[in-house]
C-alpha cells in the first residue's frame, strides 16, 4: 500500500508528501504562523524507523505512539486525542483513543469490524 500526507496551506495551496507518519505540524517549510509543536515527536518517529530499518510490528508502532503521545493539559486541546496504526497489507487499523493504549479498537478498512 501507499500512504501520503496531504497538507492544506493557509494560502490555499495543497501539498502532498510520500510519508507514512505525521504529527501535528506542517511538513511544508516556512508556513506563516504555523506552530512547530510536534516536530520533536515527528523526529523521534523518524529516528526510530531509521534504527528499525523501517520494519516494526503493529505492537511496536503502538508502543512508540504511546511514548510520543502528549499528556492531558488543563485546556484538554493539546493532548493526544487518538493514535492510529494502519496495516496496509491486510487493510486493518488499530486506534487508541485519549492515550488508552491498553484499550485498542481494531477495524478493517473495508468496513468490516474486526474481533
PLM regions and their residue ranges:
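C-terminal, well-structured catalytic/ligand-binding subdomain of enzymes
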Residues: 1-115
Amino acid at each position: 500500500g501507499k500512504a501520503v500526507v496531504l497538507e492544506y496551506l493557509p494560502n490555499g495551496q495543497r501539498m502532498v508528501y510520500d510519508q507514512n507518519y505525521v504529527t501535528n505540524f506542517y511538513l511544508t517549510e516556512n508556513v506563516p504562523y504555523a506552530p512547530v509543536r510536534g516536530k520533536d515527536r515527528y523526529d523521534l518517529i523518524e529516528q526510530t524507523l531509521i534504527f528499525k530499518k523501517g520494519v516494526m510490528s503493529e505492537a511496536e508502532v503502538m508502543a512508540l505512539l504511546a511514548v510520543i503521545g502528549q499528556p492531558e493539559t488543563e485546556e484538554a486541546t493539546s493532548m493526544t486525542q487518538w493514535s492510529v496504526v494502519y496495516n496496509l497489507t491486510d487493510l486493518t487499523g488499530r486506534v487508541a483513543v485519549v492515550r488508552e493504549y491498553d484499550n485498542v479498537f481494531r477495524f478493517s478498512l473495508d468496513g468490516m469490524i474486526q474481533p
